[in-house]
């Protein structure tokens, strides 16, 4: 093998191994948090904040419709 092919193979292997290592190390914290949440049990979601957010969204949507209806048609 010529040195340029050997260097190319080495660089490709280095990049692939770096991505695999980063992938595995990124899975470890998510796996730990998943196990902790499985042992603790799921928390009940606070739906009040979600409902208020949805009401605000509906209010803004109605205000936008009103504003657009007042604009002249060009």
Swiss-Prot record:
Any Gene Ontology biological process: defense response to bacterium
Location within or outside the cell: Secreted; Target cell membrane
Top-level taxon: Eukaryota
Annotated signal sequence range: 1-22
Record organism: Olivierus martensii
Protein name: Peptide BmKb1
Propeptide cleavage-removed residue intervals: 46-74
Main location: secreted
GO CC annotations on file: extracellular region; membrane; other organism cell membrane
Record family assignment: Belongs to the non-disulfide-bridged peptide (NDBP) superfamily. Short antimicrobial peptide (group 4) family.
Keywords: Amidation, Antibiotic, Antimicrobial, Cleavage on pair of basic residues, Membrane, Secreted, Signal, Target cell membrane, Target membrane, Transmembrane
Entry-annotated residues carrying Lysine amide: 40
Function: Has antibacterial activity against Gram-positive bacteria S.aureus, M.luteus, B.subtilis, and Gram-negative bacteria E.coli, and P.aeruginosa.
Tissues and organs where the protein is expressed, per its UniProt entry: Expressed by the venom gland.
């Amino acid at each position: 093998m010529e040195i340029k092919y050997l260097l190319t193979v080495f660089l490709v292997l280095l990049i692939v191994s770096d991505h695999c290592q980063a992938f595995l190390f990124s899975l470890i914290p998510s796996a730990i948090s998943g196990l902790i949440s499985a042992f603790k049990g799921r928390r009940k979601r606070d739906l009040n904040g979600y409902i208020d957010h949805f009401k605000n969204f509906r209010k803004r949507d109605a205000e936008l419709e009103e504003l657009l209806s007042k604009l002249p048609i060009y």
